[in-house]
Design a protein with these regions (language model features):
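A conserved amphipathic terminal alpha-helix motif
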Residues: 102-143
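A short, polar/proline- and glycine-enriched secondary-structure boundary/capping micro-motif
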Residues: 29, 78-82, 106-112
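Hydrophobic ligand-binding cavity/cleft-lining segments
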Residues: 1-36
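Short coil-to-beta transition motif at edge beta-strands of beta-rich domains
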Residues: 39-45
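Hydrophobic-ligand binding "helix-grip"
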Residues: 36, 48-92, 97-104
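Hydrophobic pocket/interface hotspot
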Residues: 17-21, 27, 45, 58, ...
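Alpha-helical scaffold segments that form or flank carboxylate-/histidine-based iron centers
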Residues: 13, 46-50, 112
Length: 143
């Protein structure tokens, strides 16, 4: 398997960054404006990107430090993929390690997803640091 990995820092408390990952109203500010579902382990989340939907299960949740989504159903080939967010402190910043597991090759789908995750993770950083993200479907979203 060939994972997508991103490592970056956010100048916000770790608890606030984690809350932005699990609170659906905050997810809708940085990821996609249409998010439905729960926020505890075993719950499902439905993310809408225009006509495209992505349904994930919260496979693992360790409060404040780790969140894992497992892709259940999607209009892109990510069923069974795992999306892992790991947080810790690094000085006065929150370090975020993101991993998307599930690709067998670095094809166009992999490249597109890698680019998209970079964009959304920067939106997460902007939301946590400045209070405004660039979620898909929001006025701030850049195509």
């Amino acid at each position: 398997m060939i994972p997508i990995k991103h490592l970056f820092h956010i100048s916000s408390p770790q608890e606030e960054v984690f809350d932005a990952l699990v609170n659906t109203s905050k997810l809708s500010a940085w990821y996609t404006s249409k998010v439905e579902g729960g926020n505890t382990q075993g719950d499902q989340l439905t993310f809408s990107f225009g006509e495209m939907k992505f349904i994930a299960e919260i496979e693992e949740l360790i409060q404040g430090t780790k969140l894992v989504w497992k892709g259940l159903q999607a209009d892109v080939p990510v069923e069974g993929h795992r999306f892992i967010f790991e947080l810790d402190r690094n000085g006065d910043k929150t370090r975020v390690r993101f991993t998307h597991e599930g690709y067998d090759e670095q094809d166009d789908s992999y490249a597109n997803m890698n680019y998209s995750w970079g964009k959304y993770l920067e939106s997460l950083r902007q939301f946590c640091q400045k209070g405004k993200g660039e979620a898909f479907g929001s006025p701030a979203y850049r195509i």
